[in-house]
A protein has these predicted regions:
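Alpha-helical substrate-recognition element adjacent to the catalytic core
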Residues: 1-21, 25-151, 155
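C-terminal cap/substrate-recognition subdomain and adjoining C-terminal extension
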Residues: 2-13, 103-237
Length: 237
């Protein structure tokens, strides 16, 4: 079994615990370079404390159902792609205006916004979240590198679900990082909080598991960039 496969297996067991306890832990690979050249983040639940889909489901009174389905997928209890398509079907028919209104209502923690704006390294948001959400967040913080799942609208502007050919799943995240960094995964720091981040976290040299409820992303990232955070250093809030 390769080191990447071993890291993926370890993360598979650690992620449900980390989500339950709102913990953060750092897992560098043996191939990790001392100097980090690229930094990337998941979006929902990592950069934002609020998840988009439960907020959209609130418009139809199904927020609790959506929250439970989302948590099951992020903890790895249900397959991500299957769950994402099902959860998206619950939102079909929302107006474009309603979707964008909810997107604009979701804020980033102040320290997270500061972190994204102050990083001097190439920085990207790598997420399976809806592309309009990712684009909106990137515009707010001045980032141009991102990937998200494309969505469709009907001719009269109603939300019509996902483009099945453009869903960003765990493999899609890893593939984006490979291309964006020109293969420099050993010198890349990736931060994520769910099962959809497994492939990316296992592939990069510097993996940080972090849930937004932990509340110290800026401090942890700067510790890693300055080589001050020990491997598998679990912190809880």
């Amino acid at each position: 079994m390769s080191e990447t496969e071993l890291r993926r297996e370890l993360l598979t067991h650690l992620i449900p615990w980390g989500r339950t306890t709102h913990s953060a832990f750092y897992l560098p690979a043996s191939s990790a370079t001392a100097e980090i050249t690229h930094v990337a983040f998941d979006l929902d639940g990592t950069l934002t404390t609020t998840e988009l889909l439960p907020e959209l489901a609130r418009l139809s009174g199904r927020s609790e159902e959506m929250t439970a389905l989302t948590e099951a997928a992020m903890a790895g209890a249900t397959p991500f792609r299957e769950s994402f398509i099902h959860r998206t079907e619950l939102l079909r028919g929302l107006s474009r205006e309603a979707l964008h209104s909810v997107i604009r209502s979701i804020t980033l923690p102040t320290d997270t916004t500061l972190l994204l704006r102050e990083l001097s390294l190439p920085t990207a948001i790598v997420t399976g979240a809806y592309q309009p959400f990712v684009e909106d967040i990137c515009e707010r913080v001045g980032l141009s590198a991102f990937v998200g799942s494309a969505v469709r609208y009907t001719a009269d502007g109603k939300f019509d679900g996902l483009d099945p050919e453009a869903i960003i799943d765990a493999e899609g995240k890893r593939a984006f990082l490979e291309e964006w960094t020109a293969g420099a995964l050993a010198s890349t720091l990736y931060t994520g909080d769910g099962a959809n981040d497994l492939d990316a976290l296992a592939a990069v040299g510097h993996a940080l598991f972090y849930t937004a409820q932990h509340g110290d992303l800026r401090g942890l990232v700067h510790q890693i960039l300055s080589a001050d955070l020990p491997p598998l250093f679990p912190t809880t809030r």
